[in-house]
Amino acid sequence: MLIQENLSIQDKLKILTDAAKYDVACTSSGVKRKGKAGSIGNTSEAGICHSFAADGRCISLLKILFTNQCIYDCKYCVNRCSNDVVRTAFTPDEVCRLTIEFYRRNYIEGLFLSSGILYNANHTMEQIYETLYKLRNQWCFNGYIHVKAIPGADAELVERTGFLADRMSINLELPTAEGLKNLAPGKTRDKILAPMRQIQQGISVSSHLLGYDRGYKKPYSTERAGFAGGAALIRPELAGGPGAALDRTISAGTMKQGAARGMIGAAQGMAGAAQEVAGGNPLKDMHSESHVGNHSKGLKSRLVLPASQYKKSAFVPAGQSTQMIVGATPENDYQMMSVTQSLYRNFGLKRVFYSAYIPVNEDSCLPSLPDGPPLLREHRLYQADWLLRFYGFRAEELLSEDRPNFNVFLDPKCDWALRHLEGFPVEVNLAPYDQLLRVPGMGVKSASRIVAARRSGRLGFEDLKKMGVVLKRARYFITCSGRMMEGARLDQDYITNCLVGDEQRARWDIEHRDSFRQLSLFDDMHMEMPVTRDDHYAAAAGHF
């Protein structure tokens, strides 16, 4: 490890921005806060990330590491302690000056601050807290801040940082505890989930005390995968977890004593519970298990600050997120999505990010990737993640143990529809909103427009096109006034050929020679519209 001292701030910036490029930033701030007199900066709920790098990563935030020094030796990480790279660290004042100067030049709209572990978790978290405190109170920076919580840090440090940040995140790193043990032996699932639960509880108390629901409203407010505060939705046995207990306390307090007194009582009760275990090991009641959802029963409240603090300012108003590496361990897509669903439902996460594994180190435990990083797989996981959060799908609907991976040629929604043709075609003039959402080519906005527009008259295919429906996909799964679009028919092979194309279908048949498919009279592609070169490119990119 080569620790460089007396480096200029420009040299540090070059080293620590490059070291942070593998950490996934947020795609939108998720919180809206207007500017105020005496302060600079504001946050925009939709679009803090305006531009993307060539590899698709967001570059509109100042994304840096506080330090690339680290005590851990994670096999996949470029900053692992065994790597012979130049090490350096910012000071809190340097991060503040950089953020303000970049903001004044209109280079950025916010800060994304992560870090390696410098000396120990508490020391690193103290430095991050000092940085945010100075930015908010001395430099009067009112812009967006996304900060990484350090696993294993003191609960009070994490909690105080949450009142200064807009979003916090703790990287889950890998979907299973076994994978984490193999590739990141210094980290444990317990250390990662403890602050994640603490942030969830703080968000829930703060949102009820201040009267907001994490700043956004989405469909399926009580059933969708990522609804606020849900600790017991994925499995009934999780009903005894601390998140569910908090929900019950809040509900009871609201009904019996009024909203304000109920929220204060809940917060005080959780703070008292945290003080009871403060004398011992705060992780002693947590049990190491391979599936993330099972941890909810052992996690206790770790909120330390009094309820009065939660009444003054919002705690992590943009919610928390996490990141998983795709392709570094042998878990399949079904396992990845099951863990994602569990995180949304048990920990109330706002986003789960996926990062295709990029080999930066040589190690016998790491996979070889002759075809490069699994970017298409990452793309499919993001598409499925969207279906979980906004379309009412469940992981077990999209995949199963018999079909554990996503179709590389079709997006998850089209693939699901082709396997459930018994539910199609859907009559757009009569179908409920939930059913419209499951039609390929229809999104949340277009489905809402259809429901609103059909009150004043019957809709045709031209009307749907004007509303934003992608008829190239939707035409095979809908009817207007009882009629399908001209040239479309409800046949699995026909629809698959039209969506994927002859060249991609042939490739699929070669790669799946053990799969059996009944021959059809309609396999002659000369009977149908010719497939263009642009169609081949679009199918290969997953745009169909």
Language-model segments: residues:
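Flexible, acidic/Gly-rich N-terminal and inter-domain linker regions that tether
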Residues: 1-69, 470, 478, 486, ...
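Conserved, mostly hydrophobic/aromatic
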Residues: 61, 74, 113, 170, ...
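Short, charged beta->alpha transition segments
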Residues: 62-64, 93-104, 308-309
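Canonical Radical SAM [4Fe-4S] cluster-binding loop centered on the CxxxCxxC motif
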Residues: 64-93
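Conserved AdoMet/S-adenosylmethionine-binding subsite of the radical SAM
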Residues: 96, 119-391
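Short Fe-S-cluster ligation motifs
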Residues: 98-114, 384
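Long, highly charged, low-complexity intrinsically disordered interaction regions
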Residues: 362-437, 473-526, 532, 543
